[in-house]
């Protein structure tokens, strides 16, 4: 007996005008999550999800492509204005922000929410190249 083809449920369109874009730029990858004001995820994307592998994930171009993808998905739900929260030391911080602005979003505020330890965990050893 043949299996029934699975029905793919289409995402219902939420009419959310403003939200928060969380840009997490690590040394290895850049992740962009767009949420509503309460913190519920509307769309997300990352450099790895866009098909970049290895050291290419950490490039500014990969962050730009990921931000464009997350922005396009959020715009489908009617989002127009964004607050941007940037965290992490990675190279994709500025390019992700510029890509969101170029995608047609009005950026109302930019906040750096990078956590700084009050002398917490011991850091990684220094690289010797």
Curated annotation (Swiss-Prot):
PROSITE patterns named among the record's database cross-references: RIBOSOMAL_S11 (PS00054)
Cited Gene3D superfamilies: Ribosomal protein S11
Molecular-function GO terms, alphabetical: rRNA binding; structural constituent of ribosome
Transmembrane segments: none
InterPro entries: Ribosomal_uS11, Ribosomal_uS11_bac-type, Ribosomal_uS11_CS, Ribosomal_uS11_sf
One GO cellular component term noted in the UniProt record for this chain: ribonucleoprotein complex
Annotated keywords: Ribonucleoprotein, Ribosomal protein, RNA-binding, rRNA-binding
GO biological-process terms attached to the record: translation
A Pfam family per the record: Ribosomal_S11
Described function: Located on the platform of the 30S subunit, it bridges several disparate RNA helices of the 16S rRNA. Forms part of the Shine-Dalgarno cleft in the 70S ribosome.
HAMAP family named in the record: Ribosomal_uS11
Subunit-structure text: Part of the 30S ribosomal subunit. Interacts with proteins S7 and S18. Binds to IF-3.
Similarity comment: family membership: Belongs to the universal ribosomal protein uS11 family.
Protein's recorded name: Small ribosomal subunit protein uS11
